[in-house]
């Protein structure tokens, strides 16, 4: 499976690998795109916005990495909910050994999350690119 050979060690690296994958697929990628404010006033930013250069179809990606179990996992449902307020479709891309099996199951069940190692085929289907 594409991506399996790439070991992700932190959140910044996950974002970098997502952007690199987008470029390999011929997509534009913009990082830390501001999209208004959250209800309590904090700026809402999307980690990565992908744009198909011909169709201009867009997709926002939140990149979540967790190396050990802990409270960061508890914030994921709020992230899934926050994506609903974006002006474009969105997805959580997650990686790391710190996500419990229950959280992995929850994320996948929402239809709004994908593990990094499964991102390439997901993006190909979403943007209408060749599956190779």
What are these regions (language model features)?
Residues 28-55, 70:
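Active-site metal-binding core of divalent-cation-utilizing nuclease and nuclease-like domains
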Residues 35, 65, 120:
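Active-site-proximal loop/turn and secondary-structure-junction residues that shape catalytic pockets
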Residues 1-37:
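Acidic-basic catalytic patches of nuclease active cores, encompassing PD-(D/E)XK
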Residues 29, 90, 113-115:
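Hydrophobic beta-strand scaffold residues
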Residues 58-59, 64-110:
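Catalytic cores of nucleic-acid endonucleases
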Residues 94-132:
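Domain-level recognition of nuclease-like catalytic cores that cleave nucleotide substrates
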Residues 23-27, 87, 111:
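Glycine-centered loop/turn motif at secondary-structure junctions
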Residues 15-16, 43, 76-80:
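Short amphipathic alpha-helical segment that frequently serves as the phosphate-/nucleotide-binding helix
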